[in-house]
């Protein structure tokens, strides 16, 4: 296992959420990504069949002999950052969140691959670090009205594990450019590739939710709500929100978008506990 290809994105995301807003016009410097090719590639009239293919492509990191050593290393590195104080060390809250997201993890045999870290912050963020750490903010859960929305974020993060090699190559290109190597053209192509991967992870999430009998549309609406309520918080190399929603809604059968969203007892208890913490 190599150092996380998501580490630069992880640092940028957490810095953005925990330290200061990035005030930039939405879309002013957003990489252009053709949405239709992504929709054409990922559209499935049989989501369950598509998921079976992905199940064969998804590596099980916990099966690696060095898994525990690597996970410990990644956790120790994370604990040295300025973000560690925001960790919500509450076993009950962590256990309830684990119960909510478990269906997506089990589907891809990832239930024993992640150390779940709950970050206490109001900005909704989910992040997969190296396939061994999974971080979700309390804000993500607090905004959710159904398990489907939370599972949509988690499935998106699982999708990154399929594309980690492409992500690593694109990130390497950007790092070289920042050091004065490479060309503007290569830099732009790398940014476009990262934005395309994000759309593909949205498609992965949508098809996965449909295969689970969940409503992918709730995930898309969630993204639009976050964009509306947090207009000053933007990330590099992310496609526009309306493009993300178009992908989410068009890669699955229309019937999937009318599925009734579910709210489990675990999510209800989790949201209640978080509400109590906010009142303290």
Where are these regions (language model features)?
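C-terminal capping/extension segments of zinc metalloprotease domains
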Residues: 24-89, 95, 106-113, 121, ...
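Catalytic zinc-binding patch centered on the HExxH motif and its immediate surroundings
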Residues: 113-132
């Amino acid at each position: 296992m190599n150092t996380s290809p998501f580490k630069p994105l992880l640092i940028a995301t957490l810095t953005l959420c925990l330290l200061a807003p990035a005030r930039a016009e939405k879309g002013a410097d957003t990489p252009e990504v053709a949405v239709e090719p992504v929709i054409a590639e990922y559209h499935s009239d049989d989501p369950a069949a598509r998921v079976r293919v992905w199940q064969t492509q998804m590596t099980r990191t916990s099966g690696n002999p060095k898994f525990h050593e690597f996970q410990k290393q990644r956790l120790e590195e994370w604990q040295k950052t300025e973000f560690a104080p925001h960790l919500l060390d509450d076993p009950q809250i962590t256990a309830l969140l684990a119960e909510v997201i478990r269906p997506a993890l089990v589907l891809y045999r990832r239930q024993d691959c992640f150390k779940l870290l709950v970050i206490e912050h109001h900005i909704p963020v989910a992040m997969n670090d190296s396939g061994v750490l999974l971080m979700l903010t309390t804000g993500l859960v607090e905004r959710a009205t159904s398990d489907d929305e939370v599972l949509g974020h988690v499935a998106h993060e699982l999708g990154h594990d399929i594309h980690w090699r492409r992500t690593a190559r694109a990130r390497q290109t950007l790092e070289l450019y920042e050091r004065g190597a490479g060309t503007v053209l290569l830099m732009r192509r790398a940014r476009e590739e990262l934005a395309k991967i994000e759309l593909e992870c949205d498609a992965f999430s949508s098809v996965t939710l449909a295969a689970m009998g969940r409503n992918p549309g709730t995930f898309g609406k969630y993204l639009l709500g976050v964009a509306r309520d947090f207009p000053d918080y933007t990330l590099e190399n992310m496609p526009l929100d309306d493009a993300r929603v178009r992908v989410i809604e068009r890669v699955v059968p229309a019937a999937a978008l009318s599925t009734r969203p579910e709210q489990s007892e675990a999510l209800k208890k989790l949201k209640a506990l978080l509400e109590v913490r906010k009142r303290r």
